[in-house]
Amino acid sequence: SVNVYMLPFIRPSDVRRRFPDDDTESFDSAFKAAVSHLNVNENERNIILAHQFITGAAAGGSESVSVGGLDNISAEVFEPFDYAALGHIHHRQNITSEKVRYCGTPLKYSFSEVNDKKTVTIANIGKKGELSIEEVPLCPIRDLREIKGTYLEITDRNFYDKFNREDYIHVTLTDEN
């Protein structure tokens, strides 16, 4: 069997209301307190789904992050788990190893993500401690595209023949006329 735990985005005030005797002054301490109350059996296979900003993650620009990293939590809190499937960051990435991973979003939400290749992450959990990750590429019906050109170029219908006309575009004019 595999135990699956889910924690939403947690603020210190959320944990303080539920566990008033725990240290919950920071996001990190609040998340650690919440995990400690899950009673994880480390001899079994454990997966956690969480929506937090982990120290060391690279934000892509379209996510909301706090000034100074106040809402960061340490990746060490995931040590009792065989896999941590994380949300909050739009770009797929491993944090300390493939066992602590942001899968990224399936769609691009901002032009800061225009060059991202979106995927679905498949995590295969074998025996205790065995993990393999597979990424399946996604091909959106409509993509985000950045184009540059003069006013005359971008207003010429033929300019768009080389693109999917259904894509969402961000246009940069290279002239002032």
Annotated model-derived regions:
Residues S1-N177:
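Extended recognition/assembly regions associated with phosphoester-bond processing machinery
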